[in-house]
Amino acid sequence: MIDEYKQRGRSGHMKLRASRTNFELFRPNSRLCDIDKKFCVDYGVWLQSEYLNPQGKVIAQSTAFSYFWYLGIILSRACQKGYIKNNPWKLLSDHEKIRQPEGKREFLTLEEINKLENTPYKKDNIRRAFLFACYCGLRVGDVMGLRWSDISVNGGRHFISVVMQKNSKPISLPLPAKALSWLPESREQDAPIFALPSYTTIRKHLQKWAEDAGLDKHLHFHLSRHTYGTMLITAGVDLYTASKMIGHADVRPTQIYAKIIDKKKEEAVSLIDKVF
């Protein structure tokens, strides 16, 4: 599975490798057939209470969440490949899973997006990939693995159909014209659309590009995804539809974007109160 992710240009192979190391620390010599619901629950508890980072401290909630959810990805893929008959991950209730911390959701304003669009950069494939993601909301791993064969036309509308890396679920999205405008001209069906380097390299170039554009924000593909989600809610798309377009399993994560918009409205009213 690690080799498959590397060949497809997906960013998750390092997390998969780390997850394999974690399993060895948690339950040495465990096999796929040994993983049941109790294993999953105990692994989540271990990540949050016993697993230590290189500094000897308990890892952050967000890191524990990431490692825990990669177990779900591994089990889902193993079930698809026929390595296991049943997926014990599906037996977990919400309270038995590690929850993602809400944290702060930053996004780009239209003015900031315009600045980026008007700022050329030497690595145009990275620039195009990021702006494309701002208008379709794909995660970085899905953008890295994207091929021309994943894009189709139906009734004059372009659609993108992929299996999401994070949860192995298929998603089909209509692409707006702005997203299409950032696709490169080269169209080899089986080649990656953007031909991106490693995510570490991508982040370095994104930050340099942001500096060139005069932005005081740390650019990353979570930011492009949050930007897309915020755009949908601002445009008046209902939470259920927005959650499906973003690729969320339910509306709860999508509600965060609605809270962001509500907070911005409150800030705007506060500014008016100060002026008048």
Regions found by a protein language model. Give the residues of each.
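Short, aromatic/basic-rich helix-turn unit that serves as a nucleic-acid recognition element
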Residues: 1-20
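Catalytic-site neighborhood detector that most strongly recognizes the C-terminal catalytic loop/helix
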Residues: 164-168, 246-271
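Conserved tyrosine-mediated DNA breakage-rejoining catalytic core shared by Y-recombinases
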Residues: 91-94, 136, 145-182
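N-terminal DNA-binding recognition helix of tyrosine site-specific recombinases/integrases
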Residues: 22-23, 30-35, 53-91, 139-141
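Long, amphipathic, Lys/Arg-enriched alpha-helical "connector/arm" segment
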Residues: 98-125, 135-138, 146
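Active-site/catalytic core of tyrosine-dependent DNA strand-transfer enzymes
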Residues: 174-216
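DNA breakage-rejoining catalytic core of tyrosine-based enzymes
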Residues: 33, 84-86, 98-115, 167-177, ...
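Short, polar N-cap/turn motifs at the start of nucleic acid-interacting alpha helices
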Residues: 150-157, 216, 237-256
